[in-house]
Amino acid sequence: MPLKLSLKPGEKFVLNGAVVQNGDRRGVLVLQNKASVLREKDIMQPDQVTTPARHIYFPVMMMYLDEVGAEKFYEEFATRLNEFMGVVRNPVVLQDCIAISKHVMAREYYKALMLSRKLIEYEDERLGHVSSGVSAGGDAG
């Protein structure tokens, strides 16, 4: 099933590891086969990895962007997820953590990544006074 991306003028995204930028007009891109695509708003930079949930999101993002080298990010992901689950008591969030782990084990990195956003949202609700990295809505800052 094709993936249709509607792009804003100047919008950047990563396509199979390459940074691509749309021109000065709105555009539509249709991908006919499987590819790793991540919009600029969903990309977290290393200096934005400042909270426990973001320490989960980042290695999942790297596994998604570099499926061939995913194993080098797995240990960091597993360690950080285990730490997070050790302190969280919310059963819904714990179920999300389990689902993220299952998606990663199945190499369904995009699903794991999008579910990891829920952890950031949960964390942002608890630490609302802290503003750093990719927000649950995808806006940096």
UniProtKB/Swiss-Prot annotation:
GO terms for biological process: bacterial-type flagellum organization; mRNA catabolic process; negative regulation of bacterial-type flagellum assembly. Pfam families: FlbT. GO terms for molecular function: mRNA 5'-UTR binding. The keyword Repressor applies. Keywords: Bacterial flagellum biogenesis, Repressor, RNA-binding. Coiled coil: none annotated. It comes from the Bacteria. The keyword rRNA processing does not apply. NCBIfam families: PRK00794.1-1. HAMAP family: FlbT. Belongs to the FlbT family. Has a post-transcriptional repressor function in flagellum biogenesis. Associates with the 5'-UTR of fljK mRNA and promotes its degradation. This is Probable flagellum biosynthesis repressor protein FlbT. It comes from Caulobacter vibrioides (strain NA1000 / CB15N) (Caulobacter crescentus).
